[in-house]
């Protein structure tokens, strides 16, 4: 387990990018699959049904779950594939691409495509589909991949099995963007706005039917591009919120529960469940609008808030992980090797001093922060956060809203920032992580402004064009120090992706970057 003490002493073996030139020669997803099933004798056949208490956040936007944007959940790799994939160590690997290279500053990227890949309808996947998919994802109106919309200027075919991305600005870490959960490859159409609604992908399973607010059914793709994969005949998924997850598991309805509630771990184990937990997972970022006349416009109040939160208590009480990492008030994740811990974990006396200096010697009551319980433990988590802040004289209510319609609600006023709220933050590479508090993101910095913000943006652009990993590391540390000093938002940290499965299921693995797993090509069941 990677804990805070290891981060502070530098003794942990920490996940990271490695040397950039290796990106183009990275081992493929096939190597990962082969290594995972090495020395096993997988059984062919069987049906696996999973329950997932965490629906796709975009379900309220469309009932057309055949499109990867609106699938039942965001773990879409069973039906679709992307050009690249991020492995369990957060290293990027080729998926439908076989290699990728860039010019010196990372402003132009060329991808070579895997040959002989077939869509579920029998059409071969070529550069026509890859270019059209990329343009769909980058489209200003209907595109759903924010990093494409920020960075992709245009996309060009390079023969039948290649494409070229021309970016708006350099980004030496761009292959991570082509692994995003919405960046799936779809069948090209003349009108790219119409793409994706047929449910046709290149993944190991073919979609049979879907009600994206309830369940989906899929069957084995006999023409999958990994020979002999998958092993299962059918894969089905069901949204299983609240007690439905544990009840469905104990009754035998579900073989697997993805994103299991940590408060139910003991019940799952008593029912014979086997747990798998990733090193980290999605996290919670508090968006604090600073463009309105609110008390936290004063940086001293924001610093006091951060110092008052008992993050180790969250890890201990909610996750039973007392030595887990804690948020550093950036979008960085504890498993990033570039992660820089806050110099002080918690200091109630300093929090009170800052409040008094800001004109609140008797404490302060702050505007409510809204959340929806995307993850089942959230109501308990925010209770711990709120109670710990009271010790410093800070009263802050965390108000629960339904997840269906949550985004329209929080974004309905004070555009483009919206209401005070918590946003979900997936574990990503450092450039994408740190871009979320920059001028590339209109909401999550919360209206952060001033010299620190300008310097932060300059450093982000510099890091994106820097091919030397050591130099990028120094830049990323400087950026994190700026954010920790000005606290544009607050990161809780410590959460880990987990799943539970029955004893007869093999190779079900939770992934730090939630949407990259499980790799169903590796999964098989005993008779």
How should each PLM-predicted stretch be described?
Residues 50, 122, 255-259, 387-442, ...:
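Periplasmic binding protein-like
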Residues 49-104, 135, 198-202:
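N-terminal lobe/hinge region of extracytoplasmic solute-binding protein
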Residues 223-267, 395:
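Ligand-site clamp/hinge motif
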Residues 499-527:
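Long beta-strand-rich cores associated with HINT superfamily self-processing modules
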Residues 323-357, 374-380:
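Structural transition elements
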Residues 41, 153, 395-406, 432-503, ...:
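Extracytoplasmic/peripheral linker and loop segments enriched in polar/acidic and small residues
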Residues 112, 146-187:
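Surface-exposed binding/hinge segments that line
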Residues 74-77, 86-91, 171, 179-234, ...:
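Gly/Pro-rich hinge or "lid" segments in bacterial periplasmic/extracellular proteins
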